[in-house]
Amino acid sequence: MSNQNLGLETQAIRTQLERTQYLEHSVPLYLTSSFIFEDAEDMRASFAEETPNNKNNSAENENGVLGIPRQITELFPKKERNIYSRFSNPNTSEFVEKICLMEGAEDGYAFATGMAAVYSTFAALLNSGDHIVSASSVFGSTHTLFTKYFPKWNITTSYFDVNKPETIENFIRLNTKILYAESPTNPAVDILDLELLGKIAKKHNLILIIDNCFATPYIQNPIQFGADLVIHSATKLIDGQGRVLGGVTVGRSDLIREIYLFSRNTGPALSPFNAWVLSKSLETLPVRIEKHCENALKVAEFLENHSNVASVKYPFLKSHPQYEVAKKQMKLGGNIVAFEIKGRIEAGRKFLDKIKLCSLSANLGDTRSIVTHPASTTHSKLTEEERLAVSITDGLVRVSVGLETVQDIINDLKQALE
């Protein structure tokens, strides 16, 4: 039985490292900085990235570990000989393999944070003089990366209006190398037509990179629509409980190879412990996401009918401008609800001060509901003009809907809005 033929839920649970001689049921934590070699030839071959030496697996035969028939829990192949945990680690490899299977990707690399994934992916693939075409609505740190740091290396970025995808090709130049977007976007929850982006990227021979953080592999798979690479901040819904940081990029093996070589030498690797936590978190991702989305839709419907709310954006609300696109490419609407509170920036601050149950935090995708006012927090370093350019108004509030009893979440938002 091949893992590719299994359901996503089964892949998330049963994709697992080969068992050791102890026949453990749950994968152990490989908390080690480095790995040993059997002899000089083993060491040479490992650094030369030749076929892994299997001397250490002498107890294993074609029927499985210690003669016990191989189960679907032991199906993913050993891709490399582990040398040093900055390069690879069994726990990290397992986590990456799960994401690859769930996203339909050829290969991947895991990072210490989501922004390490974003930076390393771009830095590995771009050269001085290259150009990026990006959606205007992107995460604040990504925007800062594009506008403040990349220009130091003569890498420029042009932004297209997420509500005017027909204008994308107007921004493409001879030196454009990457087309980039988030969908849904952070924090405005705009939706981009991934199929359209895929066609444009293919037509102009561009690398299409999609940040799939808000959707997760359970809700949306951008590679199906033509994306070359998919990025996740695993800190968010993949972990799901606000415990660890992590990021991952998956996609075409030739591009991942470049990202791997860059990251192997610059050191943004995910720690074995965090990889172990994140891999275990994926086992419950489908169940968690179903409940997150169920709660979020009810919260969005409540907010849409509140007199102190000017507007609400949630992908599966029929009032969302890109509702039809969302239904085409997303299985569910996600757990993020964005709404415009009447009264601009001061009203947003007062609303946060009145919150009692929900948490005030810059994170999202937690079991606990989180409320954020982007204009005064995550995007406060942008000018008002820059914020408006990325769909962030002074009254915008982002709610990461958690797993609490949904009526308790609604009651908290209701009293804070009054």
Region spans (language model):
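Basic/polar N-terminal segments that are highly enriched at the extreme N-terminus
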Residues: M1-E9, N56-L66, E418
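Short conserved active-site loop signatures built around small residues
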Residues: S2-Y30
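Active-site C-terminal subdomain of aminotransferase-like
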Residues: Q4, R14, E38-D39, M43-R44, ...
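Conserved PLP-enzyme active-site core in the AAT-like
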Residues: E9-L17, D107-N308, K313, E324
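Solvent-exposed alpha-helices and their adjacent loops that cap or buttress functional pockets
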Residues: T20-E24, F76, C100-M102, A124-L125, ...
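Conserved N-terminal alpha-helix of the aminotransferase class I/II PLP-enzyme fold
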Residues: S34, D39-A116, S141-K148
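PLP-dependent enzyme catalytic core of the Aspartate aminotransferase-like
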Residues: E106, T147-K148, T156-S158, L174, ...
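Short, solvent-exposed amphipathic alpha-helical segments in soluble enzyme
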Residues: Y149-P151, N265, K354-L357, K414-E418
